[in-house]
Amino acid sequence: MIKRLIVISILLIVGTVLCGCMEQENVGQQNSEAQEKIVLKIFHAGSLSVPFEEYEKMFEKEHPNVDVEREPAGSVACVRKIIDLGKKADILASADYSLIPQMMMPKYADWYVMFARNEIVLAYTDKSKYKDEINSTNWYKILQRPDVKIGFSNPNDDPCGYRTQMVLQLAELYYKDPTIYDNLVLKHSNIKVEENNGTYLILVPKELDVDTNKLFVRSKETDLLAPLEAGAFDYLFIYKSVANQHHLKYIELPKEINLGYYEYADTYKKVALKIIAKNKTINAKPIVYGMTVPTNAPHKKEAIEFVKFVLGHPEVLENNGQPAIIPAVAYGNVPEELKDLVKIEK
């Protein structure tokens, strides 16, 4: 009897040890699998957050060995992370394609693709003052009322912010009223404007200083959504796609000033903006998104595959209010894997 108990005890101990070894082996395999997963890092414009979240889920489903990590910010800030802070990203997607050739090429990028369009609208909520009175013809008069507070993103950090300045300066030309931009921004900030033979250069200082009683400013446009919905300010200049994605009410601005139409490119270019901190001058132009794989991207193969995936599924952009450019237009040393999906310009 005693011998049987001893044998049983030994068997139980051996079994426990074996189970523990098997569990450790399984955990080790799981950890190994997790470690083998490729982390694809994407720096992208805040206005691409909704469609890129969809792309992330779709891409990961088809590529289970890839973990897509997105880091949204103002497009200028995204670029600076790479060229100034030395951070590495597998993909850079900007709300202004021109930032890639102007700031990244040739050292940090040698090609880019223009893949989607947008336009600026004036968004508001049920809490906004004069919401029942404002329309597409009197909006600029409503905004000038003393008790109305407007919001836009920082022109130093975000294309939506500097495009807002361009839109308001263009509004002066369109409505033939030289006081619009002055009353809405210049009198309430340290932004300046220089006029030369019918063209205008907006000067944005390194440190933006605004009258917070009139202007509400944050780094990128998506940072302004929650405060707008909470009633912290009344009206927000933002991309039409973002307004649609967040179910905001909005006023459509005239085509001649909303930066959304190629046929008005000559009108838009009457205005330019200089970011003094970077000594960069940006001409107003139709809003076009750009994307590239930086030259120092850690996972170029997977990054190019993601770009190819985006270009192959334009319906995601279309469904989120950002018309896709079909075929996408590409410049530079375009990867072979993308050449069948793009129109290459010299």
Curated annotation (Swiss-Prot):
Signal sequence, start to end: 1-19
Positions that bind molybdate: 46-47, 75, 158-160, 221, 239
GO biological process: molybdate ion transport
A Pfam match: SBP_bac_11
Keywords: Cell membrane, Membrane, Metal-binding, Molybdenum, Signal, Transport
Residues annotated for tungstate binding in this entry: 46-47, 75, 158-160, 221, 239
Subcellular location: Cell membrane
Gene Ontology, cellular component aspect: plasma membrane
InterPro entries given in the database record: ABC_trnspt_W-bd_WtpA, ModA/WtpA
Transmembrane segments: none
Classification via NCBIfam families: PRK04168.1, tungstate_WtpA
Described function: Part of the ABC transporter complex WtpABC involved in molybdate/tungstate import. Binds tungstate and molybdate.
Name recorded for this polypeptide: Molybdate/tungstate-binding protein WtpA
Species name: Methanocaldococcus jannaschii (strain ATCC 43067 / DSM 2661 / JAL-1 / JCM 10045 / NBRC 100440)
